[in-house]
C-alpha cells in the first residue's frame, strides 16, 4: 500500500542555522553551516529544512536517500565523496544531541496557570494552588490537594483525599482512587488507573470467593512516569509504592502492596504480582511476569517474556521461564536444539542393547 508521509508533523515556526545548532549541542558543522533548519524528523522521512540523526549503523542505508537539510553523525563516521555537498554535524552522541533539539523545535505545551474550566467539579475542602490548571470535565473529590503548576488536562477523576504535588501532569481520563499520593514532576498518561482494588479474594465454602477489603493506597514518588492504560492497585493495607524516578510503560499492571525501587524501568505488558519488591535500577522488559512475595536485588535486568518465579539475589541479566542467569539460559536453549538427535541416538542405543 502506497502511503505518503508529511514532511514534518512537528514544525513550530522556529528557525535556526546549522551553525547555531552546532554551537547549541556542542558539535562540529561540516558543509554549509548557513542552512536554516525549521524542524526535526526521522532519517528516512526528513526533508530539506529538517534536521535528523544517525547513530545506529543499521540505519545507514537511509543516509543516501535522505533529503534532510542536516544530519547529526558520530565523530568517527566516515563520509564518502558522494556526501561532499551535504551538511552534517559531528557529535560524540548524535542521539543525545537530537533529543536536545526536540526540546528546541518542539517545546512542551504550556498550560495556563490558575485556570479552572467551568465544567470542572471540585469537592468540599479541596485545596487547589493558584497556579494549577484544571481542564474540562475534571472531577475532584473532597479534601484533595493539588499543588502549584500541577496540570489535570481533562476528564481526570480524583477520588477523595488525593494529593498531587507540584509540576505533575495527569493526562486525559486518568483516574486516581482515594488517598493516592503523586509526587513532584510526575507524568501520568491517558487512561491510567491508580489505586483500584487489589486482586484480593478469600475462598470460602463450595469454591465461592469472598472479597477482601482493599483499604490501602498508592504512593508515587517524584519524577515518575506512568504509561497509558497502565494500572497500579492500592495496597491491601499500607501502601503500594512506586519510588522516585520510576518509568512505567503502557499496559503494565502493578498489583497490591508492590514496591518498585527507584529509577526502575518496566516495559509494556509486564505484570508485577502482589507484594513483590523490585530493587533499585531494575530493568523489566516487555511481557515479563513477576511472581508475588519475592524480591529482586538492585541492578537486575530481566529480558522479554521471562518469568521471575523466585527471588533474585544478585544484579545482572536474567532470561527464560523460570528466569535464570542469561548465559545459563542461552546454553540450555542451545542444547535443546540438539534434543531430537539425542533422542534418536538414545533410541538406537536401546535397540542395540535389547538385541544383546
How would you name each of these model-derived features?
Residues 53, 115-325:
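Structural signal for interior beta-strand "rungs" in well-ordered beta-sheet cores
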Residues 1-119, 180, 185, 191-192, ...:
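Terminal amphipathic alpha-helical/low-complexity segments used for targeting or macromolecular assembly
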Amino acid at each position: 500500500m502506497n502511503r505518503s508521509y508529511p514532511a514534518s508533523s512537528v514544525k513550530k515556526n522556529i528557525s535556526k542555522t546549522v551553525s547555531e545548532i552546532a554551537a547549541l549541542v556542542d558539535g562540529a558543522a561540516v558543509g554549509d553551516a548557513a542552512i536554516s533548519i525549521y524542524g526535526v524528523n526521522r532519517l528516512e522521512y526528513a526533508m530539506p529544512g529538517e534536521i535528523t540523526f544517525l547513530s545506529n549503523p543499521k540505519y545507514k542505508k537511509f543516509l543516501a536517500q535522505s533529503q534532510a537539510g542536516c544530519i547529526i553523525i558520530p565523530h568517527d563516521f566516515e563520509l564518502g565523496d558522494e556526501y561532499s555537498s551535504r551538511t552534517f554535524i559531528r557529535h560524540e552522541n548524535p542521539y543525545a544531541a537530537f533529543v536536545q533539539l526536540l526540546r528546541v523545535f518542539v517545546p512542551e505545551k504550556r498550560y495556563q496557570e490558575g485556570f479552572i474550566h467551568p465544567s470542572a467539579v471540585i469537592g468540599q475542602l479541596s485545596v487547589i494552588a493558584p497556579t494549577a490548571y484544571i481542564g474540562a470535565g475534571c472531577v475532584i473529590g473532597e479534601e484533595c490537594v493539588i499543588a502549584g503548576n500541577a496540570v489535570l488536562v481533562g476528564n481526570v477523576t480524583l477520588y477523595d483525599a488525593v494529593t498531587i504535588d507540584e509540576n505533575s501532569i495527569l493526562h486525559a481520563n486518568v483516574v486516581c482512587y482515594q488517598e493516592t499520593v503523586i509526587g513532584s514532576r510526575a507524568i501520568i498518561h491517558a487512561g491510567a488507573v491508580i489505586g483500584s482494588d487489589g486482586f484480593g479474594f478469600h475462598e470460602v465454602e463450595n469454591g465461592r470467593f469472598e472479597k477482601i477489603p482493599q483499604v490501602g493506597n498508592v504512593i508515587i514518588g517524584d519524577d515518575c512516569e506512568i504509561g497509558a492504560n497502565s494500572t497500579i492497585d492500592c495496597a491491601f493495607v499500607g501502601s503500594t509504592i512506586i519510588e522516585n524516578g520510576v518509568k512505567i510503560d503502557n499496559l503494565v499492571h502493578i498489583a497490591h502492596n508492590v514496591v518498585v525501587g527507584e529509577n526502575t524501568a518496566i516495559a509494556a505488558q509486564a505484570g508485577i504480582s502482589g507484594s513483590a519488591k523490585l530493587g533499585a535500577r531494575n530493568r523489566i522488559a516487555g511481557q515479563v511476569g513477576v511472581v508475588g512475595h519475592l524480591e529482586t536485588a538492585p541492578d537486575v535486568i530481566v529480558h522479554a517474556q521471562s518469568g521471575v518465579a523466585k527471588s533474585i539475589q544478585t544484579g545482572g541479566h536474567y532470561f527464560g521461564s523460570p528466569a535464570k542467569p542469561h548465559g545459563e539460559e542461552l546454553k540450555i536453549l542451545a542444547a535443546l536444539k540438539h534434543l531430537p538427535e539425542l533422542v534418536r541416538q538414545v533410541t538406537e542405543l536401546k535397540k542395540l542393547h535389547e538385541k544383546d
